[in-house]
Amino acid sequence: MAAGRMILDVGCANGDILAPLAKVHEIHGVDIAPGLVERAIKNGIHAVCHNLEGGPLPYPAGKFDAIFCGETIEHQVDTDWLMFEINRVLKSGGKLVLTFPNIRTILGLGMMLFFDLPPMYAARYRSMHFRDFTLRTIKIVLKAHGFRFERAIGSAFYLPKIEEFWSPLATYLPSWAYTVVVIATKQTDSIYSSESIMPTRLY
């Protein structure tokens, strides 16, 4: 990506992830926690405090060349509103990099099959995660909101004691990785409806 681009970090926390890019790009960020926003500003991020479910992102349509949304989508009750707003402030042809905790993991399937427990990082009782995703459902979400899926990369497998041995394979088997990085391109504008319901049949 050429220098001088406008990039938004949705759910930026303390800004550590995109701070290295602030030397060559204009990085903006939003987060709900005032203390984290203050730290993000110190890291060179143009950060503001904002509740993602409390109203529109505080930016005009088509402002950003790229958007990063890391480990945030699972914390939102209204997934469609989040994706609509990301689409709105992203330029046509702009890139979205989205990461999420994948519930379709070897350990997660074992927890459900043998212990009658939800997978790690799932929307469990008293969890801060409100929505569960797999790579397939994320692709459905992206398509529903005007994005073209480009590629997915798995970050690691969670397999105690043998994680270091198996984790390199996650790059090539993202649908089994416990964290997935997805890259997508905005093709069309999104339409939001508070009554929209994702189908629960076999997609």
Predicted features along the sequence, with ranges:
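A short His-aromatic
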Residues: 71-75
